[in-house]
A protein has these predicted regions:
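His/Asp/Glu-rich metal-coordinating catalytic cores
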Residues: 1-68, 73-240
Length: 240
């Protein structure tokens, strides 16, 4: 998408599960939103992970002002070490828990790959309003399966570009998981040029149930089980 001095380019995460990465350019300044990987299809033998192509970002390295990571899931943050290896020197913005896990991930990468990465990690609060390279950037809390998740709104002359990522609306979630619909409304009133949200379940009718509603579904299974129960779950689904 190109609109006056605004360019939005998906570098991953389109028509695929995982590998999310987007370039949002405002007046020649590039914001990278998320940097994830995805697992390969079964026929990709010998391939452990698939990351986005960084060729465009390497060409435009001098114009990149920030990497923003919205939450601590591998599909949106685990390609970050590879990205920093390609374009070192770009500051990384992330909420607190995400920043903690980024530090652990970078340390693991450096020890196993025998490479030193320079990373300027800037922690943000979930409802921060800051400026990056002179451009206003708004963060807003979202409800996801890991605490500290945020959405991002980047100012442009024609309205905000809002990146919602992965979220549900649930006012009953515990602190840390809770969304802030008021902050979203305030951004909406200021004017929105483009809204970008995750849509893997968009073809399903109805609404996504909050995680805590699983309790009643599986409680009877625990009560009636004659022996040991083994349950598999997504490792980074902290709520469950």
């Amino acid at each position: 998408m190109k609109h006056n001095n605004v360019k939005i380019m998906p570098l991953g995460g389109q028509a695929e599960a995982g590998k999310s990465m987007y370039s949002i350019e405002v007046n020649g300044k590039i914001f990278i939103i998320d940097a994830g990987y995805r697992f390969p299809d079964l026929d990709k033998l010998g391939v452990d992970i698939i990351i986005p192509s960084f060729d465009y970002l390497i060409e435009r390295k001098k114009d990149i002002v920030a990497i923003i990571i919205t939450h601590a899931h591998n599909d949106v943050m685990a390609a970050l070490p590879y990205l920093l290896n390609a374009i070192q020197g770009v500051p990384v913005y992330a909420p607190n828990l995400t920043a903690d896990l980024i530090e652990m991930m970078i340390d693991h990468y450096q020890r196993h790959q025998k490479k030193n990465l320079h990373m300027e990690l800037i922690r943000v609060k979930r409802d921060d309003s800051i400026k990056i390279a002179g451009i206003p950037v708004e963060f807003f809390p979202e409800t996801h399966s890991i605490p500290g998740s945020v959405g991002v709104a980047i100012w442009t002359p024609d309205g905000y570009v809002v990146y919602g990522g992965e979220f549900i609306i649930d006012f009953g979630s515990p602190e840390g998981f809770r969304c802030n619909i008021q902050k979203m409304m305030e951004i909406g009133k200021k004017g929105v040029l483009a809204l970008m949200v995750e849509s893997s379940g968009a073809s399903n009718p109805g609404y996504t149930s909050p995680n805590h509603k699983l309790t009643n579904k599986i409680e009877s299974m625990f009560e009636d089980a004659p022996g040991r129960i083994i349950i598999s779950s997504y490792a980074q689904n902290v709520f469950r």
